[in-house]
């Protein structure tokens, strides 16, 4: 269900049951595979998994949402665990995919669990911030969007779209809610271009949206 990720002659993919595989792109030969739900004691979600995996240097980023890890970095050459992010309460994984960006001199990764948007340090997996993203179905679908120090999370049916300003605070990063939009895109996320967020509405307003990134 998820797109493959290509890096240095290898393809990486996770199937709908949490099996992550590394394939030789030229031959299709499987080089290694790991069940991340089993390794990190996660449970599959109602409509199964569809995370597009993120390659960061020698790391492959996955979001098992298990009792042993909310997020994890695997060695992309072997599948061995490099770092983990501590679980976030009872949160499971979601249908979203992680993104990597730089803010305040740090490399950061953000994604969504079943009930939160969250951000971690890309080098250590340390959990830095969370933002509530609850809805009656207990899952989130749209991949976060980052731009100009803000990150945008959206969940359908409930809290809609919210932007958070990231602020460096000593050794940490906090996320301050700055605006809310009726935009409730559900499966396609959005695109940020020249200060405008473009995306399609779902239940609340079935329109195309162009949202000012600074004001909402």
Predicted regions and their residues:
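Short loop/turn segments that connect beta-strands within beta-propeller blades
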Residues: 24-27, 35, 75-78, 121-125, ...
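Extracytoplasmic beta-rich repeat domains
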Residues: 1-5, 33-55, 67-68, 84-106, ...
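Eukaryotic tandem repeat interaction scaffolds
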Residues: 164-198, 202-205, 209-215
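Hydrophobic alpha-helical hairpins/lids featuring a short glycine-rich hinge
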Residues: 1-36
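Residue-level signal for tight coil/turn positions that link beta-strands
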Residues: 8-9, 17, 27, 57, ...
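WD40 beta-propeller blade core
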Residues: 21, 72, 118-119, 162, ...
């Amino acid at each position: 269900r998820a797109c493959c990720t290509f890096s240095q002659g290898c393809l990486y993919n996770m199937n709908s049951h949490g099996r992550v595989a590394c394939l030789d792109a030229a031959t299709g030969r499987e080089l290694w595979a790991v069940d991340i739900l089993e390794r990190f004691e996660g449970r599959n979600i109602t409509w199964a998994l569809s995370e597009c995996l993120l390659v960061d240097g020698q790391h492959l980023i996955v979001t098992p949402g298990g009792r042993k890890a909310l997020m994890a970095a695997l060695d992309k050459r072997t599948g061995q665990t490099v770092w983990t992010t501590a679980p976030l309460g009872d949160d499971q994984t979601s249908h979203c995919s992680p993104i990597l960006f730089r803010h305040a001199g740090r490399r950061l990764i953000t994604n969504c669990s079943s009930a939160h948007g969250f951000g971690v340090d890309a080098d250590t997996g340390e959990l830095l911030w969370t933002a509530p993203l609850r809805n009656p179905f207990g899952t989130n679908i749209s991949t976060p969007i980052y731009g100009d120090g803000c990150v945008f999370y959206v969940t359908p049916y409930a809290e809609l779209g919210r932007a958070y300003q990231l602020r460096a605070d000593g050794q940490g990063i906090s996320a301050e809610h700055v605006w809310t939009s009726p935009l409730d895109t559900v499966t396609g996320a959005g695109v940020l271009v020249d200060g405008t967020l473009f995306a399609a509405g779902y239940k609340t307003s079935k329109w195309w949206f162009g949202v000012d990134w600074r004001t909402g």
